């Protein structure tokens, strides 16, 4: 099934200037980057986006990291894009991520783990709308 998913290239990817390499992994997997933009999250935006994790011990460090520098948000499209991208990202903890995955090949640690990807169709819709307006998405149809 043709799906869209949200991808975030986190501040560590932008800071280390490896966005092109990560994008190559995405495109070589068969996923299409249909739109992307660079932005700098405010603390409020980061807290809102990750609100589901508010009660977790990693919430504050995650928010701190996500506001530490620019990010790149992307809409990816392809057959079974959500599960394909999650497989391509690799395990959250790069020590457990397989070689050939984004985190396995590029992530420095569990906090600076390079990427975020939607984990379900419902979350993909919500997360894409969080970063992209209807106007921005209209031209993608």
Swiss-Prot record:
Q: Which Pfam families match?
A: NDK (PF00334)
- Judging by the UniProt lineage, the source's domain of life is Bacteria
- Broad class of enzyme this protein falls into: transferase
InterPro entries given in the database record: NDK-like_dom, NDK-like_dom_sf, Nucleoside_diP_kinase, Nucleoside_diP_kinase_AS
Provide the cofactor list for this protein: Mg(2+)
GO terms for cellular component: cytoplasm
Give the matching CDD domains. Answer: NDPk_I
Q: Which SUPFAM superfamilies does the entry link to?
A: Nucleoside diphosphate kinase, NDK
Q: Which EC number(s) does UniProt give?
A: 2.7.4.6
- Entry keywords, A to Z: ATP-binding, Cytoplasm, Kinase, Magnesium, Metal-binding, Nucleotide metabolism, Nucleotide-binding, Phosphoprotein, Transferase
Residues annotated as binding ATP are 10, 58, 86, 92, 103, 113
Q: Which GO terms describe its molecular function?
A: ATP binding; metal ion binding; nucleoside diphosphate kinase activity
The family database entries (PROSITE patterns) matched by this protein are listed as: NDPK (PS00469), NDPK_LIKE (PS51374)
Q: What positions constitute the catalytic site?
A: 116
Q: Tell whether Nucleotide-binding is among the UniProt keywords.
A: yes
Biological process annotations from GO: CTP biosynthetic process; GTP biosynthetic process; UTP biosynthetic process
Localization per record: Cytoplasm
Q: Which reaction does it catalyse?
A: a 2'-deoxyribonucleoside 5'-diphosphate + ATP = a 2'-deoxyribonucleoside 5'-triphosphate + ADP; a ribonucleoside 5'-diphosphate + ATP = a ribonucleoside 5'-triphosphate + ADP
Q: Which protein family is it in?
A: Belongs to the NDK family.
NCBIfam families attached to this UniProt entry: PRK00668.1
Assembly with partners or alone: Homotetramer.
What does the UniProt function comment say about this protein?
Major role in the synthesis of nucleoside triphosphates other than ATP. The ATP gamma phosphate is transferred to the NDP beta phosphate via a ping-pong mechanism, using a phosphorylated active-site intermediate.
Would you tell me the protein name for this molecule? Nucleoside diphosphate kinase
Q: Which organism is it from?
A: Ehrlichia canis (strain Jake)
């Amino acid at each position: 099934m043709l799906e869209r998913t949200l991808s975030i290239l986190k501040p560590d990817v932008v800071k280390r200037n490896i966005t092109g390499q990560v994008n190559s992994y995405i495109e070589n997997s068969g996923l299409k980057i249909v739109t992307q933009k660079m932005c700098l999250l405010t603390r409020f935006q980061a807290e809102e986006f990750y609100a589901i994790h508010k009660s977790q011990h990693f919430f504050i460090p995650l928010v701190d990291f996500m506001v530490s520098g620019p990010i790149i948000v992307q809409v990816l499209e392809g057959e079974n894009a959500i599960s394909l991208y999650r497989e391509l990202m690799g395990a959250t903890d790069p020590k457990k991520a397989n070689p050939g995955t984004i985190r396995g090949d590029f992530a420095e640690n569990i906090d600076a783990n390079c990427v975020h990807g939607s984990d379900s169709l419902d979350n993909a819709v919500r997360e894409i709308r969080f970063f992209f307006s209807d106007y921005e998405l209209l031209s993608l149809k």
